Amino acid sequence: MSAYRKGNIFIISAASGTGKTTLVSRLLANHNGLRVSVSHTTRPPREGEANGVHYHFVSKEEFESLIAQEAFLEYADVFGNYYGTSAEGVNALAAAGYDVILEIDVQGAAQVRDALPEAVGIFILPPSFDVLAARLNGRGTDSREVIQRRLSKARHEIEQSVLFDFVVVNDDLARAEEDLRHIVNACRLKRSRQLGFIADLLENS
């Protein structure tokens, strides 16, 4: 966290099964000053997921009430479940100087970029479609039909990677995490992000 600047907002997107969630968890554990925006969703929790930590799990009625209140930076219906990013939560973290990670799909990323053009987009790519299919099958949580739908959607999502600022290939977790850390550090060191520090330095010279 920096006392001199508003935090960066990083949008991290990927096709399902690319390892995005694992990468974000590793980045948060090993990199100071980062916070993840906890999304709202209407889907049931998976084993090991905690409310308020992995997601804010809400009913469809609660989610639609928040939509009516314009509480989301973005939201989407994904395979029959709502997902959304709280505008208030993101803005509060960034105002406090934290860099905020939004772990969202490409549809949500486009909505956030429209609302926050300064946000930095990072897309995680699989090394191949064969590896992606193996990862989805290895989860053991989805039917064959759902997996085929996810693979079909993955192709479309990967085509949208051209709209992002950076791409990271996740063929090795440690190397992909290092790539993400380099991106975060480079964005923190932009002159436009250091104006508060420069002004304070000159004022006290």
Swiss-Prot record:
UniProt GO MF annotations: ATP binding; guanylate kinase activity
Entry similarity comment: Belongs to the guanylate kinase family.
Organism: Neisseria meningitidis serogroup A / serotype 4A (strain DSM 15465 / Z2491)
E.C. designation(s): 2.7.4.8
Taxonomy, superkingdom: Bacteria
GO CC list: cytosol
Record keywords, A-Z: ATP-binding, Cytoplasm, Kinase, Nucleotide-binding, Transferase
InterPro entries according to UniProt: GK/Ca_channel_bsu, Guanylate_kin-like_dom, Guanylate_kinase, Guanylate_kinase_CS, P-loop_NTPase
Subcellular localization, as worded in the UniProt entry: Cytoplasm
Binding site for ATP: 14-21
Protein name: Guanylate kinase
First-tier enzyme category under EC: transferase
Role: Essential for recycling GMP and indirectly, cGMP.
Reactions performed catalytically: GMP + ATP = GDP + ADP
Guanylate kinase-like domain: residues covered: 7-185
Pfam families assigned: Guanylate_kin
Cited SMART domains: GuKc
CDD domains: GMPK
Disulphide bond pairs: none
PANTHER family registered for this protein in UniProt: GUANYLATE KINASE, GUANYLATE KINASE-RELATED
Gene: gmk
